[in-house]
Amino acid sequence: MKKEVKRRAIECAAAAVLYIVAIVGSSYAELEREMRLLIFLLPYLIMAFATVRLLWNNLKKRKLFDENLLILLATAGAFAVHRYSEAVGAMLFFQIGKLLELISMSRTRKSIEKFMDIRPQYANLKISGGEMQVPPEDLNPRQVIIIKPRERIPVDAIVTQGSSTLDTKALTGESEPRHVKIGSHIYSGSINLSGVLEARVLKASADSTASRIIDMISNADNRRAQTENFAEKFTRYYTPLVTLFGILVMILPPMMFEGAQQGAWIYRGLIVLVAACPCGLLVSVPLAFLGGIGAASRQGVLIKGSNFLEALSKAETFVFDKTGTLTEGVFRVKEVCPKSITPEELLELTAYGEAYSSHPISGSLREAYGRPIDKARIGAVREFPGFGLEAVVDGKQLEIGNSKFMNQQGYFYQRVADIGTAVHVAVDGEYAGYILITDVVRKEAGRLLKWLKKQQIEAVMITGDNERVAEDVARQLKLDYVYAGLMPEEKVEQVREFMESHMEDEKLAFVGDGINDAPVLAHADIGIAMGGLGSDAALEAADIILMEDDLSRIVNAIRISRGTIRAVKQNLIFAIGMKVLLLVLASFGYVTMKNAILADMAVMMINLLNSFWVLKYPE
């Protein structure tokens, strides 16, 4: 785009100089009509060539009627009726307007790309006897890299030596440095602030976090909002209609009114064509959406397309998963309650049985056990999502899960009076007791729910946990609806039923962790995943990604989406209103060709300023 801006700027500058020479020459010298035509034709052809080039590109896309055709017809017609100066002036101002449009789009994209240009140029690969600089693209998993202070992390990796603090602002929008040590995951695009780190490569450069984020932002243009489609569809019908109107202005008045001069009405018709150019309408809508996506990315919120940005502004209901979304998802063992074995045995067997599970509860059980897991002691393991698992540990048959799982297996299990999640355990066909797990509500969840309530947005929670735990969380956060005890597939069905029974044209947003909620994220109008940093599942499944586990970012995203839509609507109303006014004035001869183009440029610039202002101060 930089080359295109430079080329257009040179064309406009050259044409402007020749236009001034032509005006001065025709004003101070007695020139024949043919000579006047020649000196004005040169700057006109320079700019007309650029217009024809744009028109030809659109023709290849089967788009004939556009602003390029209107200005070409109008200015060529002005030449035909010997209005050379006005024809060149109109074409010059039109091309300057297109140049400003290109510069605005280029700068907006550049600001996003600059912010997202987080891929380093090199990596320090550790080799025998030292290190060597290589392109990040040459790195492979399991190789060891060295990251020095002030260098960017080249690829996703895990720290094997050293400790440091990282600046992750480009990825997460979070200004607080992040401390890392041996065993910490580090993500491409972060900046090492202090110590020297050695890290083992986890992913190739193309699959690392920075590259995937940049690709996602770059492809956001491909998903267009309904308002963008409306603007394009409107101009598709608008342009041929105003072309016909301009022709009728040239033809009908001389036929209908006695004494009407054919030449004067032809000129008015040409002005109508110039006044009808929809440049201000076309540029302001996509630029506002592009700016909105860029503003959100600077807040650590990645939006995959303008259609999702628009949908978010219309969201009237937010559905939240409980574990890891409204709660911290960092479980703690509150109590070990054995029946037929010792507490130590119950915890040890359960930790071993859960050794291969990725569920947060499994991690809390292993953490509570606190010792290394000898996987040689573990035999066959079979998971039942939403219920529990079967495992063989030390030759003993374990069945570990929730109350539903115990019911399925036919065990008489102990009812739990305390609030929390009970993990029941059976050993060799005999109920052995339960372990009570607790979670805590996120600090920012309460603030988010209060804000949503003020905005008259409904808040719903769905969870696979039991009703008592779910009701306790709902009571703390004052949720509107709660659905508990749901299997993963039942969550999708519950969201579908809620949309059918409670909603009409409103949009529903689902907020989850992006790992276990992919089906629900896909089914909702807007799928929002938390903790996208380092989560492949979140980057793939969600429409909007919060790069940090921070629910307050949702407030920022909603404000930006509403500000964007407000700017788009204001721009559309203003642009269409000004077009109607200009067409009326042009029809009655109150506007010259140059003034019509200047008015269109003014509309475009006002809309651009409005878009930037609204996005800077969304609410």
Annotate each language-model stretch with its function.
Residues A22-I23, F40-Y122, K126, N140-I145, ...:
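Actuator/coupling domain of P-type ATPases
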Residues A29-R33, F79-A87, E258-G259, S587-N595:
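Transmembrane helix interruption/hinge and helix-loop junction motifs
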Residues G395, V427-Q570, M578:
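Conserved ATP-binding TGD loop and adjacent catalytic N/P-domain core of P-type ATPases
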